[in-house]
Every structure is written in C-alpha cells, then in structure tokens.
Amino acid sequence: MRILGIDPGLRVTGFGVIDQSGHTLSYVASGVIKTADADLPSRLGTIFEGISTLIRQHSPDQSAIEKVFVNVNPQSTLLLGQARGAAICGLVAGGVPVAEYTALQLKQAVVGYGRATKEQMQQMVVRLLNLSGVPGTDAADALGMAICHAHGGTTLSTLGGIAPSLAKKGLRVRRGRLVG
C-alpha cells in the first residue's frame, strides 16, 4: 500500500510518500510545496495543484493529514485550516481516502512520546525509513504522518495513552519492558 502523508501549511506544505508491505516501510519520496508571496486564493490554488500533481506522480492508495490545532493567534489557525482544506480537496478530488491525526497521535506513533521535539521526529523518521540523510522538518512531519497511518495511528495513540496510568503506579516502559 502506498501512503501520502501531508503536513499542511500556507507557506510550506510538507509531503512524504512511503510504501507499506506487511510490517516493512519503504521511502518513496518527500519534499515541500512552497507558495509564492501572493494573495490567499492563489496560495490555496498552488497547494491544491501541488497535491494533485503528487497524486498523478505517485498514485497513493491512502493519505494522512495533520488535524488543525488552535494556535495562540486565531488568524494563523484560520489560515492553516484553509491550507489544510485545500490539501484535503486535492486528495478527495484525486480519489484518495483521507485519514486525520493530531500532532499528539503523530508523535506517539512515530517517537513513542506525545511531546517529542521536531529533531526527535526527524531522527525517528530517518531510523524507521533507513534514510541516508535527514529530511527537513516539514517533509519529516509528512513522512511521520504516513508512518503514523501505516502503523494504525489511532490504535497506537490509544495504546500510548496507557503510559500516564502506568506512571501513576510508578511504572514506565523502557526498551519495550515495564520497569518500576
């Protein structure tokens, strides 16, 4: 199965394409769609067209995109939501099913910790996909989104939610084992 991950943004939208065969994940492509300093409709059109081009080039079976979070600045949140909407419209117009995950679900599925840093995300993406170089943060987040979906992001996020209850009991997970 081929998965297209999207990290939406009005100026820079990250994308990552991976193949999943059983438990094996393989890197296909990643990068960014950059919008010019133009009016909002033109930028949204660039995102839509960029997604459409990616679908034609890579023929994904599924896609995953980050849910919008509420920013301190409401205007930024609205603009991000519009960029996300343009990307989703491109995916739907291309006939690609869309799954949505929060940043917390993404980080728990890829790093195992919901408050992971951008650098930790990048390093885990490199390890999980056996990359020779470190992708930029937008591309890494998009690849992470695809990995999250491949690993059944919602299930992993739910399992990750068990960790706080274990911590209250003085237990934690270390190297796949419970320690106390």
Curated annotation (Swiss-Prot):
It comes from the Bacteria. The active site is at D7, E66, D138. Mg(2+) 2 binds at E66. It is found in: Cytoplasm. It holds the Pfam family RuvC. PANTHER family: CROSSOVER JUNCTION ENDODEOXYRIBONUCLEASE RUVC. Homodimer which binds Holliday junction (HJ) DNA. The HJ becomes 2-fold symmetrical on binding to RuvC with unstacked arms; it has a different conformation from HJ DNA in complex with RuvA. In the full resolvosome a probable DNA-RuvA(4)-RuvB(12)-RuvC(2) complex forms which resolves the HJ. This is Crossover junction endodeoxyribonuclease RuvC. It comes from Paraburkholderia xenovorans (strain LB400). The gene is ruvC.
